[in-house]
Amino acid sequence: MKAETTYMKTLGKVEAKLSRMKEQAAAVRWFYENGNLPESYNRALRLEELSEQTVLLTRVLPAYTGAAGATAQTDAIISNTIPVEVGFTAEGWFSVRIPALLPKKASGSADYIRSYLYPAMRKFFEGKPPVRFRDCVLAYRHVYDRSRPERAMRDHDNIETNMVTDILALYVLPDDHPAVCSHYYCSAAGSEDRTEVYVIPKHDFPMWMVEEKTLPDKGVKLYEVRFC
């Protein structure tokens, strides 16, 4: 059967990736223990890249069995593992909180983001009327673990934000054309890594800029419905 062939081919790719991850993990340790931290760092980056690629493969593996409900069960696992928070602030701004920094632009990074953000957005808006912000600012706030200050200097142009913007546009924007939505990027220190995204009417953006300096460490309370 075709489904079985695809299933086994994908499983083979997973096994190959795991083998390469094991090799890279050994290299990370070897270079570190032999005093070559720069090369250990390079190998660690490669290990992380292989890990992301492996995750993408394992996420589609259950569906290739043809089992009913495989996609829904996989989405539930993703939701529990990467608990994305979605809602409206007290001011009426739409917000998404992702419990990680967004990855750099690379092969597979957009698919990785789509795999956890799209199900979270779909679930939040299920049964709710559409919301469309016009003439707004899309603000990306990269919150980095203060124990890792080197992450403060992020190259915002090299971060995979396009997929996030595209998914948000499906639910809260007419589209992401510059005439509709401007973009703003900033970084802040926190107790742990996360990404906060806000959709703010332009006339409210000066207010958000002031409030951004004193946002609580865990983020503001988000509501199921928009009050404003």
Language-model segments: which ranges?
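Amphipathic alpha-helical interaction surfaces
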Residues: 60-63, 127, 167-171
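C-terminal edge-of-domain segments
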Residues: 177-225
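Short amphipathic
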Residues: 83-102, 139-144
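N-terminal targeting/trafficking signals and adjacent low-complexity tails
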Residues: 1-75, 81-83, 89-93
